[in-house]
């Protein structure tokens, strides 16, 4: 991190304002090469974070635009390094020319997420907070934004640190027993240690229970459209999405792969997945599509079983219904209400033991679509009560966090069982160490380059 990096921090395209960011040794001097203040004070001499008005220059020193600039010095900047920021009009050409001038002044192009990665490496934020930055940038609903904001303040980190501290106390006891065998130390203190381990296991288990809610808030509800070929699944996807996302033809089997679209209804995010009709086929391409459809079903939070309301419910529909009910919460959608012969589904008592909600509509005309949307919102409210109303809510929001907490909980449970069985302190120590290492991966106490790189690969350039 001894080099100077620079990047455009605003999104590509024309805009009212464009921002360039620098971080690293000599950031103020490099920025001064491309910025001429209106007053007599040079940019490197300006007080910390004081905005100066002036002219932005190209490599040849020719004026390009007027704008603002400021310097933020270490260790009080976002990255923990000396940083500078230049603000001008959002012309892609002007931004490109100024960036070229910064490269000529000794900076290099920043990699995606490198500014936030430097903040992490300088201890300005931990891994969970770094993930919250990109979660906040990518948030598609108010609930997701509030959740990311809460994690950015370090709420989850503090909970993890408290558990880590409790395990440290247990570790300290066993280390003392092993390091000072001549001292009069009770190697087990079974009651106190068992209570300490149980408290941390309960805290970890409580966190694990938040993982589904966190995923639903940050990624949305996965809503899979299932049904026979030509039941109108693709038409329904397009109707819900509000645009032609999937190809629609009268030919059964048109959809050969899963097609996805996202839609927000009353603040809830739904990830709609249109599937290939589940049927036996000799076509190898269609077989791949069916396999992906089955994979989508395994990940479903809600299934919309789409049926042709102009036809009687047959064995194939009943088989799909049984399959859907075994996988997830299911809603029956009777499509094609605009066509002659449309009727309500009839089930014999033995067909299903479940109480089903049925919505009738026409995906083609949109008639009745609002009733389906209302039902989707009700299902989301049941899964996510009071979604995102508290920014301080502690939730695990991704698979990395969930896996780390699960490994920690399993290690603590093993340590508790070993303590009951009276195993040697060094064996207990191994389980506690593994739990602490897993928690360390969450916050960054345990630095693994593969984990760090994976997190920051999600970022855009300039952040």
Predicted regions and their residues:
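Short glycine-/small-residue-rich Rossmann-like dinucleotide-binding loops
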Residues: 241, 276-277, 301, 308, ...
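C-terminal-of-GTPase-core extension/linker across diverse P-loop GTPases
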Residues: 2-8, 12, 142-264, 281-283, ...
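Inter-motif core of Ras-like GTPase G domains
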Residues: 286-310
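Structural motif
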Residues: 89, 307-310, 336-337
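Generic enzyme active-site microenvironment
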Residues: 272, 306, 333
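A glycine-rich (often HGG/GG-containing) alpha/beta subdomain
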Residues: 1-146, 150, 154, 328-331
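Switch I (G2) and immediately adjacent beta-strands of P-loop GTPase domains
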Residues: 52-73, 253-281, 297-302
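Short alpha-helix of the ABC ATPase nucleotide-binding domain corresponding to the H-loop/switch region
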Residues: 278, 286-290, 318
């Amino acid at each position: 991190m001894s080099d100077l990096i620079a990047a455009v921090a605003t999104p590509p395209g024309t805009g009212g304002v464009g921002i360039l960011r620098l971080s690293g040794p000599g950031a103020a001097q490099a920025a001064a090469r491309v910025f001429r203040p209106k007053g007599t004070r040079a940019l490197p001499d300006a007080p910390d974070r004081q905005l100066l008005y002036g002219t932005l220059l190209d490599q040849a020193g020719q004026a390009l635009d007027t704008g603002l600039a400021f310097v933020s010095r270490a260790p009080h900047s976002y990255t923990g390094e000396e940083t500078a920021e230049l603000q001008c009009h959002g012309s892609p050409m002007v931004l490109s020319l100024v960036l070229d001038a910064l490269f000529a002044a000794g900076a290099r192009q920043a990699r995606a997420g490198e500014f936030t990665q430097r903040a992490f490496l300088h201890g300005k934020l931990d891994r969970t907070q770094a993930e919250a930055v990109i979660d906040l940038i990518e948030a598609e609903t108010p609930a997701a934004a509030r959740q990311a904001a809460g994690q950015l303040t370090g709420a989850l980190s503090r909970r993890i640190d408290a558990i880590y501290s409790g395990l440290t106390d247990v570790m300290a006891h066993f280390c003392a027993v092993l390091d000072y065998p001549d001292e009069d130390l009770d190697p087990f203190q079974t009651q106190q240690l068992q209570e300490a381990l149980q408290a941390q296991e309960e805290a970890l288990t409580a966190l694990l229970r938040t993982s589904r809610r966190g995923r639903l808030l940050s990624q949305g509800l996965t809503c899979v459209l299932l049904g026979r070929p030509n039941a109108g699944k693709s038409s329904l996807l397009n109707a819900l999405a509000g645009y032609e996302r999937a190809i629609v033809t009268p030919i059964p089997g048109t959809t050969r792969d899963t097609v996805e679209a996202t839609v927000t209804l009353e603040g809830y995010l739904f990830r709609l997945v249109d599937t290939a009709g589940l049927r036996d086929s000799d076509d190898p391409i269609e077989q791949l599509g069916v396999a992906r459809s089955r994979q989508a079903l395994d990940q479903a939070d809600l299934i919309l079983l789409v049926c042709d309301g102009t036809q009687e419910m047959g064995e194939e529909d009943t088989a799909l219904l049984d399959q859907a009910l075994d996988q997830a919460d299911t809603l029956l959608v009777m499509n094609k209400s605009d066509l002659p012969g449309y009727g309500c589904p009839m089930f014999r008592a033995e067909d299903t033991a479940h109480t089903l909600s049925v919505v009738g509509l026409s995906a083609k005309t949109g008639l009745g679509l609002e009733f389906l949307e209302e039902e989707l919102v009700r299902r989301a409210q049941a899964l996510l009560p009071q979604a995102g109303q508290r920014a301080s809510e502690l939730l695990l929001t991704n698979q990395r966090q969930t896996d780390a907490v699960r490994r920690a909980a399993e290690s603590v449970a093993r340590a508790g069982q070993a303590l009951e069985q009276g195993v040697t302190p060094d064996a207990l120590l191994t389980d506690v160490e593994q739990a602490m290492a897993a928690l360390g991966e969450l916050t960054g106490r345990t630095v693994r380059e593969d984990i760090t790189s994976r997190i920051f690969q999600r970022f855009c350039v300039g952040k």
